[in-house]
Amino acid sequence: MNTVSVVQFLAVGCAVFVLYGRGVFAAEGVKKAGQHKDAELCLGSDGLGHRLDEFWYNDDMCQRFLCFKDDEGIMYEQIANCPIAIAEGDCTLKPGTKGHYPDCCPAVECPPEDQKKRKFKRKCFLVNILTTLLTKLVKNLKKNQQ
């Protein structure tokens, strides 16, 4: 399984996890990156060159980006967006703060008796972090095998 397949699998897994957990729908994806004039850089969605394996942000859209190469040398751009938050029952929707993703994302706040929804939100955030870390780990393992 190549890096892109692993990332896509985890992103879909997170989306399914969130979908069935009620209240929040994940929004993350991977697409082929454009070719920058400097072969060492990735051409991001913003039209700028970015170093591989380094995050950059669009604070206006509350997005996080990451470029990486798969084992065939093809560059991909991972885009993380805010999940769609839906407040149900006694829960309320709290706007995100200014700053980088994920702090700028809206959040569902529930009364103390509804702790399950809070735990669920943390789990999905951890899945997003693990997806990013796993992508880097797979790349490093493949480099070490060569």
Curated annotation (Swiss-Prot):
Localisation: Secreted
Post-translational modification: Contains 4 disulfide bonds.
Signal peptide: 1-26
Tissue: Expressed by the venom gland.
Keyword Ribonucleoprotein in record: no
Keywords: Disulfide bond, Secreted, Signal, Toxin
One matching Pfam family: SVWC
Molecular function, one GO term: toxin activity
A GO CC term attached to the entry: extracellular region
Predominant localisation class: secreted
Family recorded in the similarity comment: Belongs to the scoloptoxin-16 family.
Protein name per Swiss-Prot or TrEMBL: U-scoloptoxin(16)-Er1a
Annotated organism of origin: Ethmostigmus rubripes
